[in-house]
């Protein structure tokens, strides 16, 4: 509530006029204006008078009030003009808002610039390494791995176990094409299996960069007979049949597989040249030959014919006994 002053009206007007010069926007005393303590020394009592923060001095006497009014008038006259309280408050608020907005913009810009600098520094750290040394290193590693993978398997390298497992996964057509291309030059000689190594290549085949170790196997008559019997039954025995036959003839499964590969290649070459012996329907007749062949081929063909006749007798297709063995 407003307090009613007993001072004259001129004193009230003078006190209100002095108010803006004695208080700042935060209701703090301005150092350039005499503080309330100095007014008390002069015989004044300062109290709150209205809602605008104005102070109204209540005097004990007219002489003290007159002195204060005179001081206030002198100060206002020296300042040059009367100041509006509301206009000054609005200007200060706008200034504060502008300062606050500029501070926020500055902080946002600083943070964005800092993030951009960090990103550029991080890119600058790893990208030259990746584009330069790392790319060359990765390329060298790839070349090393490719050359290592190329040395894992070569057609002329001895692979007894790995070759047996890969052969079972190949189709019959792929085996025929591979074997025909691999063994077509190996039968220009007399065609004996003893002159072939494990992979059906002669010693004087293509020259290689490194010296290769070749293994040759000499088959006995019993082994050849059993192998020819199995070949007459099927040209492509599975891995179980090969293992059983290898145990029976005292050979390794890989060697039996290589023998079947060589035998199939020999069979195809004879059919291509028209030299393959054709079995006569009657068992007592010998093979009808389409041309001259060697003694070893004749023995193999006769053994194959005997195996076919024996199988026919077991199945009950023939009633007459088989002919005596070939001497």
Curated annotation (Swiss-Prot):
Coiled coil: none annotated. CDD domains: homeodomain (cd00086). The keyword Transcription applies. GO terms for molecular function: DNA-binding transcription factor activity, RNA polymerase II-specific; RNA polymerase II transcription regulatory region sequence-specific DNA binding. Signal peptide: none annotated. The keyword Heme does not apply. InterPro entries: HD, Homeobox_CS, Homeodomain-like_sf, Paired_Homeobox_TFs. Residues 152-214 are annotated as: Disordered. Residues 186-195 have a biased composition (Acidic residues). GO terms for cellular component: nucleus. Keywords: Developmental protein, DNA-binding, Homeobox, Nucleus, Transcription, Transcription regulation. One of its GO terms (biological process) is regulation of transcription by RNA polymerase II. Residues 212-271 bind DNA. Residues 174-185 have a biased composition (Basic and acidic residues). It comes from the Eukaryota. It is found in: Nucleus. Belongs to the paired homeobox family. Bicoid subfamily. This is Aristaless homeobox protein. The gene is ALX.
